[in-house]
Amino acid sequence: MGVTETSTYRDLHLPSLIIGGSFATVAICLSLYSILQHLRFYTNPAEQKWIVSVLFMVPVYATESIISLSNSKFSLPCDILRNCYEAFALYSFGSYLVACLGGERRVVEYLENESKKPLLEEGANESKKKKKKNSFWKFLCDPYVLGRELFVIEKFGLVQYMILKTFCAFLTFLLELLGVYGDGEFKWYYGYPYIVVVLNFSQMWALFCLVQFYNVTHERLKEIKPLAKFISFKAIVFATWWQGFGIALLCYYGILPKEGRFQNGLQDFLICIEMAIAAVAHLFVFPAEPYHYIPVSECGKITAETSKTEVKLEEGGLVETTETQVEASGTSIKESVQDIVIDGGQHVVKDVVLTINQAIGPVEKGVTKIQDTIHQKLLDSDGKEETEVTEEVTVETSVPPKE
């Protein structure tokens, strides 16, 4: 560590702490306000528990960043916390889209109906053959034809990232204790480059699965304006990860000071600013106002909001529909939190177990196939040896004795 690098860090630390702390405070206050609004009007638990989980990403990021920025000793545990919650937030966003589509059963029905459209155009028999033979390529190029398989792949992609991200976070902590992690060091004898490669691939695959799922279902999600939600969330996950990776490269090649505290501090400072921007965006992207009203059939309260919609018919006629929504009474924040923790936790555990079983299944089949192949080769070799011995005995017995 050079004297110049140490001096640079000391000169910038206090101003960055003040500026970063200000942005982090704004981010936390705005996010908590938005979260409390959803908890106060918790009228659609299926959707709102995942919205709250996504919104909570901002205060988690902002809090751990300002703590890490104030004291570099807490950098690693804060980074582990951020990585774990990032993976969970990505899973929560995917679950939110599924909830907006009416739940898993309706999503599967919709995807199955979508997959039948190409069959009608191309011919059922030919398309079914292509679907069976090229499922992977269909997922990459034409996910519409996969039907139920698309939902399975999407869920597997999100959950595998959550599992790998959490596992690598604790592996990082273990390697750091052993002194072989080498944060920001791209050297083969450190664990850092290997973990970066694994997480990069895992994250890219998870995001790609989410993009493909969005491409197929975005027409059904128009009511919630999915593009703005998708961009705002993806920007946090994608930008912060590659931002940290880019800073590590710049420090490694000497473009920025190589001091570890400077590298981590710069990342934390930028995240504090970015979380304030994200918190403002979330107020408009994930508003609580749509949940302030519920269908009139679900509540006996009189205060209501009425909206009229004009529907044009093909023949030129006009139909006016009236929708009445009742203003929802406030819900208990304690009960809302309990539902998020208990019901959401059960949902996560179920999907994690299902994903692990899906991953173990092909491995078990592969191991069984290898064992069967080895066993068959051993039997074949034993059979050949027995045949050779029999031939030798036959030859010896068939030779006439010498006179």
Swiss-Prot record:
- The membrane spanning regions, by residue number, are 16-36, 50-70, 162-182, 191-211, 236-256, 269-289
List all disulphide bridges recorded for this chain: none
Where would you say this protein principally sits, based on its record? Answer: membrane
Q: Which family does it belong to?
A: Belongs to the TMEM184 family.
Note the SMART domains from the entry: Solute_trans_a (SM01417)
Q: What is this protein called?
A: Protein LAZ1 homolog 2
Q: Which InterPro entries match?
A: Ostalpha/TMEM184C
Output the Gene Ontology cellular-component terms.
Answer: membrane
Annotated PANTHER family:
ORGANIC SOLUTE TRANSPORTER-RELATED
**Entry keyword annotation includes Transmembrane:** yes
The membrane topology of this protein is: Multi-pass membrane protein
**Region Disordered: what ranges?**
381-403
Annotated source species:
Arabidopsis thaliana
Q: Which UniProt keywords apply?
A: Membrane, Transmembrane, Transmembrane helix
Give the range the annotation lists for the signal sequence: none
